Amino acid sequence: MTAPHDPLDDIQADPWALWLSGRTRTALELPHYRRAAVLVALTREADPRVLLTVRSSELPTHKGQIAFPGGSLDAGETPTQAALREAQEEVALDPAAVTLLGELDDVFTPVGFHVTPVLGRIAPEALDTLRVTPEVAQIITPTLAELRAVPLVRERRTLPDGTEVPLYRYPWRGLDIWGMTARVLHDLLEQGPG
């Protein structure tokens, strides 16, 4: 007996793939910033869950912050390769379990990172195989509907050059999702399907 066909198995029917193919990506040129990538992994469900981590308090930077799996690019590595490698290192996500859809808009951080978010889909069962590593204190998987329902906090920050940038915060189940992670989530929640 074969399993019923899941329409999201066909990448052309995936609403996130369709959304991504119909938009123009913003790529930044920031030669003095350190390159990094994160994996924005959404489950293949009617109300997708997004894979996030709570960073370990033992790390030298961004202790306890909520983040997508990700990190700096190694020499010769593409953002997609880095995002998949980091997700495997941080939460043991098998790269073969990820259906890659493409890159989202580049973002930068005030501490000098130029980040490329890479959008991918995973089966809900893939979440059962994840595990916490020394870099991660906890794995969290809020649904997009849950994040859309929380009261979004909007702030503005002035950078040293005088540029004002928006800051977003998503208070979710006693956790504070903010910074670059909240910015990428904001773009997904405001512009993406659903």
Swiss-Prot record:
Its cofactor is Mg(2+); Mn(2+). InterPro entries: CoAse, NUDIX_hydrolase-like_dom_sf, NUDIX_hydrolase_dom. Residues 33-181 form the Nudix hydrolase domain. GO terms for biological process: coenzyme A catabolic process. It catalyses: CoA + H2O = (R)-4'-phosphopantetheine + adenosine 3',5'-bisphosphate + 2 H(+). One of its GO terms (molecular function) is coenzyme A diphosphatase activity. The keyword Acyltransferase does not apply. Its EC number is 3.6.1.77. Keywords: Hydrolase, Magnesium, Manganese, Metal-binding. A motif (Nudix box) lies at residues 71-92. It is an enzyme of class 3 (hydrolase). Coiled coil: none annotated. SUPFAM superfamilies: Nudix. The keyword Transmembrane helix does not apply. Mg(2+) binds at residues 86, 90. Belongs to the Nudix hydrolase family. PCD1 subfamily. Monomer. This is Nudix hydrolase DR_1184. It comes from Deinococcus radiodurans (strain ATCC 13939 / DSM 20539 / JCM 16871 / CCUG 27074 / LMG 4051 / NBRC 15346 / NCIMB 9279 / VKM B-1422 / R1).
